[in-house]
Amino acid sequence: MLTALPHLREALVSASPSQQIVALLVVPALAVISAWLIQQIGHIVAALLLGFRVAPFNTARDCDPHRQYACDPLRISILPLETRNMYHLRRRLTLIFLGGPLAGLAFALLLEFCRDWSQASVLIQMRVHTVAAFNVLASLASLLPETGHRADFSDGARLVMLLKNDSRAARLLALLRMQRALKDGVHPREWDPAWVERATADNDQSRDAVISLWLAYIWASERQDITSATRYLEDALAAPDACPRGLRDRLYLEAAIFQAWFRDNPSNAHSWAALIHSGRLVSFEQKRLTMAVLWAEGKSFDAFEKLSDYFAALRELPESPARALAEKSALEWKHQIQSRMLTRAWRSMYNMSQQVEASATAGTLVSSHGN
């Protein structure tokens, strides 16, 4: 379209091949990159000013507190953000999501009006206008309320839900509060049930919905509410395309453990475990799965002996509230195993006594019949 302008067409025709490549390929590519970078800078600056910080990326995957619960922090584009301050959260998030598009528009205006470009060459003017135009278009596009192909919300969709304060906004706020509680080591049983209710009220199979259902599953399973835990886990597994990569394998892991521990079904446990990508499980996750499968196979003493390896793997993690919570949950699991082992032992003894009694009764009847 721009090459249809007479002055620009004449300038391109008279330019050298290298200048033409720069004008037609390099400049648009740099404009796209600059538009993306400016929006990220806008998000970061707004987040830092509003009490958020960029969360560490999962370089040491088995040591990050988020990794222990496969619970990624809030992401804006590729940036993970977190905050300890939960006050005025909706207002602060609104400004953060608005920061990126506003930064792009402000940069375009600044670039256009920082000086009089009319005295520059036509090719220079083209470069300036191209960069400014791409920033404006990218900012306007990000304000469109749409959901991406991986069920991620655009800045515009986030702004709409936060300004309307609808069920999806309530879900986002509840999700962030539960994530913060996990990282601070607050036991899921102590969470406000209203958080879980708001987090699971709107299951639109988006990324937010899947993460919320996962957190609700943790809450329900720690409360031994097996009915609710089953529902939350099944709903989370029903939307694999919206599930973050790390969480998808963790859901398969939990499905395997659920079948082994609560259903005593080793066959289904192995089926779910087979879906986990090779090498994705870290040490403490693999040991937890091994214990659960051994239990389902009836090898309760072998499962109990593996507990020491599980505790050792947890102690290898850096000290943090999240590690302390994981160790507390593991200790509770140990007590549950001991209790269920006693139940199994009493059940076995009762069955044996019933068999002995039945055999004795049958022998008495045979003797009476013979007499």
Regions found by a protein language model. Name each.
Residues 1-35:
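Topogenic membrane-insertion module of multi-pass membrane proteins
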Residues 15-26, 119-137:
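Hydrophobic alpha-helical transmembrane segments
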Residues 27-87:
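Small-residue-rich helix-interface/hinge motifs
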Residues 53-55, 143-172:
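Juxtamembrane/interfacial segments flanking transmembrane helices
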Residues 158-210, 214:
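Charged, amphipathic alpha-helical linkers/stalks
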Residues 170-174, 205-214, 243-253, 281-288:
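Generic helix N-cap/helix-start motif at coil->alpha-helix transitions
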Residues 190-201, 226-240, 264-279, 299-313, ...:
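Alpha-helical repeat scaffolds
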Residues 215, 253-254, 258, 285-296, ...:
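"A position-specific structural signal for the A-helix of alpha-solenoid helical repeats
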